[in-house]
Structure formats: C-alpha cells, structure tokens
Amino acid sequence: SMIEMLGVLAIVGVLSAGAIAEFGKAVFRWKAIKCTEEYNLFISEMLVYEKDWIKMMSKQGSGHLYIGPYMEEWGMLPSSWTVSGNRFSDRLGNHIVPFVRNDLMSFSFNRRVDIDFVLSQRKGKETAEFCRLVFHNVIIPNCDRIFAIRVAEKRNDSWNNGSGWYMGCQYCRDSRNCIERINAADIESLCNVCSEEKQACNILTLF
C-alpha cells in the first residue's frame, strides 16, 4: 500500500523532514479511520445481544454490568484490539468500555447498553481530530440506534458534567439537544475538550 511504501522510504532516509511529518499525519488518519470502522462493527455485534445484556443486568440489580469479558470470550472483538480487565484498547490507544448501567437517577437512562469511548490524551490536537472523526463516522451514522451521548473531560481524577446529553434520532423532542441537529461547528466545540493534554476525555454513548 501507499502507507507501507512511504514507511519504507522514511526508514531509509529518502523522505525530507516535511515529507516525514506528512507521512505521520497520513498514518494517523489511516489508523483513525480503521478505528471508526472497527467501532461500527463492534456496535453492531454488541447490539445483536442487547436484550440478553439487559436481562443479565436485571438479575444483577444495581450498579454496572461490564459485558466486555463476555464479548471477548465470544470472539466479538476486532483483531487489533487488546484487552485489560473490563476495557479494550484500539490501535490508537483509546479505551472502549462496554457496560449496562442501573445507577442513574433518571430511570429512562438505566438498563441501557452503554459504550464509554475514553480517548487518548497524549496526542492533544490528534485526539480532538479523532473525536471529530468519531462523530462523523460513528455517532451520526448510528443516530437511529443511539439513545443519547455526551462528551466530558476528566480533571483531578473526576469527570465533569461535560456537554450535557444529546439525544438520538428516535428520542429528539422539542427543545432537546439532538444528534440529528449537530453541525460541524457543534462538533468542533464538543471535541475541543479533547485538544489539550488533560487526563482524559470521553464520549459516553447510550443505546
């Protein structure tokens, strides 16, 4: 592929510093697009068993039911992901934590399958760029499947309230913030919390 060919040229010193920088951007973009493709596949696999996850949560009671170990055991993960306890890591080092919750005050948010996408903060602007790509390639195309999403950042070991909730297409009512109404400027604003090297930022997604 073109990426592999440029990589060889970079290693042998044929490319200039500027070309190497552009190569780095191209590699990141390629990996980022691959990640979003894997996210979409993962979501589809996960939602096949949505009713089963919710039944398991009902038997457990309150708290969180982490479904990652089951998905790993059943071979539902992309081959490029690594596993650490209840969370997965993609090829860019972002963490994916799938679970069912039963601990929010609003009952309508409980007993839903969630994915917490915790984005790597080491890359600053690259993380914000990836956040925007997740919105364009994952969140918006899955609007009909999603109940709600929000973006938040972690400072001093605690998560803030973030952006507030944006409702999925089937739950967009009246004056609510809705995914189907999000434009490019909104995405830019939402993903700005990921642009600095803070502890973490996440896109919490409820289905």
PLM region spans:
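N-terminal single-pass transmembrane signal-anchor helix
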Residues: S1-V27
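Membrane-proximal N-terminal amphipathic helix
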Residues: A21-M57
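Short, glycine/small-hydrophobic-rich surface segments
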Residues: M46-S84
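Intrinsically disordered, low-complexity regions enriched in Pro/Ser/Thr/Gly and acidic residues
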Residues: P78-F207
